Amino acid sequence: MAALCGFESLVAQSYAGEGAKIEPTMLIDKPTAGMLKRAHYAISSNYFQRGGVLVGVSVGLFDQFSFGISYGGTEIIGPNKIQMNPQPGINAKLRLFDETLMMPAFALGFDSQGKEPFLEADSLNRYTIKSPGVYVAASKNYAFMGNLSVHGGLNLSLEKDDGDNDMNAYLGVEKTLGPDISLLAEYDFAFNDNHLRAIGEGRGYLNLGLRWSWGKGLIIGFDLKNVSKNQKNVSVGNRTLHIDYIGAF
């Protein structure tokens, strides 16, 4: 992360590959300690099961603080009636400590946006993948055949109607592969998704991903989520598409 903190003021930038100019703010479903710098913005879109689309915008208000909003729904792509999420998601992140040679960067944040379809049946009132809620994240970068970033965090989601309100934890790694590509792996322990009424099977969520910078601020991502089959009716994994554009004012 420290190697990514110093960057030139470019109109459009990327967080993927060894040529990355900014810090990645997310793994796959979970946040890192990475920040959008002041006067930078990120426009993201995620495409998932049941014709789902989620669009978000985040802005770096200061080097140490960012804010964003997101909204989406299911059946947006396809012939069925569109089902929008009950409310927009909001996120805010504050960098507590910058990375040093010995210590990781730390950030405190809030993110109410869950992933995948919103579930109202049986009074669950939650996303398929719960939102992070309140979280603290740590990130450390190492020079290893390019860049190797290690991330982890603790989070407490506000989605508790399924009866599972436990504190959760997650880990992740990012490895650059050449100047434009990063490979991601994320493990969500899902301690808050293994109650009797929850939909998790107690194995946690193992997610794999790829991020590819196409230049001029455009990043394309492909994810294979829930490889651990932590929910019913999953044969291989949940395939999703992710598109980001990052620029500066």
Segments from the language model and where they lie:
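Transmembrane beta-barrel domains of Gram-negative outer membranes and organellar outer membranes
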Residues: 12-150, 155-159, 174-182, 186-249
